[in-house]
């Protein structure tokens, strides 16, 4: 599903931002399972209670670090986030697979995900990317490019979280 | 006001934990203004929307880094947090100046501070202390001691956030 920015115009994402995202994603891609896992462990380090938002963690005694469902979920979310960022400029839209953005919106709404949770995930994502690429590649511009791409994804998910107006 | 742990028993805080807190607080104390400021800037780095919880930030155009009210507030909160931690074992209670814990509870309740906000502040506090003491002094035990002291303070504030039952 394609999703335009809140203004309903095309997403603004410069060539330079796209180049930074593509360059760093190319480096991280092959290690998505581990980097995605670290992304989620960072979220839970900052906000331990966020684990209650995930059904497969609520009813599990397995430590977070060893939970296979978390590893699988974390990789899927990380890859989706990075691919949406990588395609942002080309498509001018947040692009994820069909129906996924609707499901994401509804799941996040149902589970009571708050603005602060989205912010914690943003912080965790940027910290994880910083540690996932060579130190010489990290810069304020790189941080900004990923931060903006993430904000576009969140705007799309939040749009999907809005209850449908009843006629 | 003195506040016991949730179990209404004395707070458990070991001699070792107290020693770690006292040792690191002694080093940070003289630089409380700067370290406290960094503590709050870290909170806003992780959760930018948390600035709306503070009346003196909501209506200000001054950048966070330069806001004198934030500097003042941050230092007061940091010193209170560290002093409560330093006195925890000796008193067996979270001890802050008279009426402060009630005011804290009521202010946090009124402004809609959530569990996630308290978690973000915990993460920011631990990161700030890590950077505020010599690297050789930081350890899992040090992190644990400050983390536990902070949890006791938060439990006291949350107790003060509960609406008074009506008879």
From Swiss-Prot, chains A, B:
Its cofactor is heme b. Its main location: cytoplasm. Phytoglobin that reduces nitrite to nitric oxide under anoxic conditions (e.g. during flooding or in waterlogged soil). May not function as an oxygen storage or transport protein. Has an unusually high affinity for O(2) through an hexacoordinate heme iron because of a very low dissociation constant. It is found in: Cytoplasm; Nucleus. Keywords: Cytoplasm, Heme, Iron, Metal-binding, Nucleus, Oxidoreductase, Oxygen transport, Transport. It is an enzyme of class 1 (oxidoreductase). The lineage of its organism: Eukaryota, Viridiplantae, Streptophyta, Embryophyta, Tracheophyta. InterPro entries: Globin, Globin-like_sf, Globin/Proto, Leghaemoglobin-like, Leghaemoglobin_Fe_BS. GO terms for biological process: cellular response to calcium ion starvation; response to abscisic acid; response to cold; response to salt; response to water deprivation. Pfam families: Globin. This is Anaerobic nitrite reductase NSHB4.
């Amino acid at each position: 599903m394609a999703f335009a920015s809140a203004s309903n115009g095309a997403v603004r994402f410069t060539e330079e931002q796209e180049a930074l995202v593509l360059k760093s994603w190319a480096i991280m891609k092959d290690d998505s399972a581990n980097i995605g896992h670290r992304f989620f462990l960072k979220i839970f380090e900052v906000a331990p209670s966020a684990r209650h938002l995930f059904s497969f963690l609520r009813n599990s005694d397995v430590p977070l670090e060893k939970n296979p469902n978390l590893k699988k979920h974390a990789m899927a979310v990380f890859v989706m986030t990075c691919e949406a960022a990588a395609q942002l400029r080309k498509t001018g839209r947040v692009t994820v697979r069909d129906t996924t953005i609707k499901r994401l919106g509804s799941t996040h709404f149902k589970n009571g995900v708050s603005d602060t949770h989205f912010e914690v995930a943003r912080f965790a994502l940027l910290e994880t990317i910083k540690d996932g690429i060579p130190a010489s590649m990290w810069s304020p511009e790189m941080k900004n490019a990923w931060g903006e791409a993430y904000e576009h994804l969140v705007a799309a998910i939040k749009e999907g979280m809005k209850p449908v107006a009843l006629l």
